[in-house]
Every structure is written in C-alpha cells, then in structure tokens.
Amino acid sequence: MDKKSRVLIVGGTGYIGKRIVNASISLGHPTYVLFRPEVVSNIDKVQMLLYFKQLGAKLIEASLDDHQRLVDALKQVDVVISALAGGVLSHHILEQLKLVEAIKEAGNIKRFLPSEFGMDPDIMEHALQPGSITFIDKRKVRRAIEAASIPYTYVSSNMFAGYFAGSLAQLDGHMMPPRDKVLIYGDGNVKGIWVDEDDVGTYTIKSIDDPQTLNKTMYIRPPMNILSQKEVIQIWERLSEQNLDKIYISSQDFLADMKDKSYEEKIVRCHLYQIFFRGDLYNFEIGPNAIEATKLYPEVKYVTMDSYLERYV
C-alpha cells in the first residue's frame, strides 16, 4: 500500500477547513493543522484544535507573517491545503501569497490546494462588481502558484449545502428553511450544484495523492444534486408536508434592489445573481484541464439534497 502524504491544513478551524481536517484524519493521512497565535483567545477554536489533537492531528502554531516559522512548518509535510476565509465578512484570500512564497522556499511541497471551494474564478471574469473581488483575488493566487511552478489542484465545489440548501437560498440571512413564503429567482429553473460540506472535505483529500488531479481543476458535480432552486424547494415541501407561498423576482428587479444595499450585501447578491440568474455553476462544459470528482471517486457515497434536507424537518 502506498504511503499517504502528510497534509498541512491552513485555516483548519474554519467552516470548510474543519471538514477537510476530519476527512484527512479519517482517510488515514498524517494530518497537521496550522493555527495562528491569536486563535488561543477563541475558546471555540481552541476546543476544536484539541478535538483534532485527540483524533491524532499534530498542531502547529505559526503566523503567515512569520516567514521562517512557516517554512519550517512546511518542511514537515508533503501537501498543503489552504481553507483561509474568502467570504464576505472575512476575506483573507491574498494572505495566501505569503504561503506561496514560503512553499517556494521550502521546496518540498508535492501539491498545494489553495482556498477555492466555490465557483471557478477563471471562468468568472464577467462577474458583477463588487462580487467580482472574490474571483479577482483567487485568480491572483492561482497565477502566483503557476508562476512559481508549484504543483496544484484547484477544487471547485459549487454551493455549500448549509448556506444554500438549508435556507432554500434566501436573502434574509436565516440558515433554516422558511416556514411560510419563499423568494424564487427568475423562474426558479436555472440549474445549480448543491454539495454537502463533508463531501467537499472527502473529495478534496481524495485528490491530493491522485496524479489525475495534478495541475488541474477538480469540479464537484454530484449528478443527483444538479438541481434548480425550484427543485430544491419542491424537495423541502415534500419532506415538510408544507406548501410555501412563492414570490418571484425578475433579474431586473433583483439588480435594481441592490443599489441601496451595503457593500457586503452587494457581494452576496452579486454571487446569487451569477448562480441563479446566469447559471454560472453549470452553464459550461468541463474542459481538458479539469476533471469531475464523482466520476474519479465513485466509491464516495455523496449526500443527496433529499437526504440533506431531512435534518431540518
């Protein structure tokens, strides 16, 4: 049996990072979790780190601003996965450029997976502002990786189920299904791709030692989870035995309503526009420099949205 790579996860206490840490440990990889010195003041993150340690992970304290300490950490591992936050309220994507410099100096890293886990930034050059900032910064990191000739895999995992399926993709900030009415974008029939976060972790770790994913983008497109917003709503209505009042909003009204929103709200709405009006998750064919995860790893029994939504009933 081939020896499994030693994996360092940066951002391992975050929303998707903790799933990647769990998957790495579960799949038998020697797992290292990098944490920033200031994390010790956050009781929730400290408890999570101690939990990872109990499972067998090794904890490494280092700041991305401490170049030498970062290089020393990298020399202990084979693969680096970054799960640094790239969301609206906490956006640290360009911090990864420090990680790229450290990987270059360390010289031993066999694979780097930067923080992506959403839409493919290289096909989002048309994205609306200010939502485009996410994709602009991710492209900068990609180009730095490639310029440094660092072996990579980019993971495009589409919509996190917890944020999108759990809320039926509503704008109200609630992460539970609505009980009376639901907002539908356009006619509600544009296809999207909804993915369980634990499955994102599993597919990500599966890819790190696979030569088929080397220097490629890996899309996670579970066939049974390629669904429109309306189809996800119908699943929820069937499970909950409750019919929701449907409120439809046109693309014109949706965009017009953005004008008076905060910067953060505009970013969220831009991304929703790309997904549910333009269909940017599924309106393209996977090219020769990319590969699809469920075809690569058919042994993974991914969570369907029917199954996922049962927890909310």
UniProtKB/Swiss-Prot annotation:
Give the EC number(s) under which this enzyme is classified.
Answer: 1.23.1.1, 1.23.1.4, 1.23.1.3
- Which amino acids does the record list as binding NADP(+)? 11-17, 36, 45, 142
Q: Can you tell me which residues bind substrate?
A: 271
Q: Pfam families from the xrefs?
A: NmrA
InterPro entries in the record = NAD(P)-bd_dom_sf, NmrA-like, NmrA-type/Isoflavone_red_sf, PCBER-like
CDD domains for this protein: PCBER_SDR_a (cd05259)
Task: Tell me how this protein assembles.
Answer: Dimer.
Question: Could you tell me what this protein does?
Answer: Reductase involved in lignan biosynthesis. Catalyzes the enantioselective sequential conversion of (-)-pinoresinol into (-)-lariciresinol and of (-)-lariciresinol into (+)-secoisolariciresinol. Can also convert with a lower efficiency (+)-pinoresinol into (+)-lariciresinol, but not (+)-lariciresinol into (-)-secoisolariciresinol. Abstracts the 4R-hydride from the NADPH cofactor during catalysis.
| Additional note from the record | Phe-164, Val-268 and Leu-272 are involved in enantiospecific binding of (-)-pinoresinol while in PLR_Tp2, a 'Gly-268' and a symmetric substitution between Phe and Leu favor binding of the (+)-antipode of pinoresinol.
Output this protein's name.
Answer: Bifunctional pinoresinol-lariciresinol reductase 1
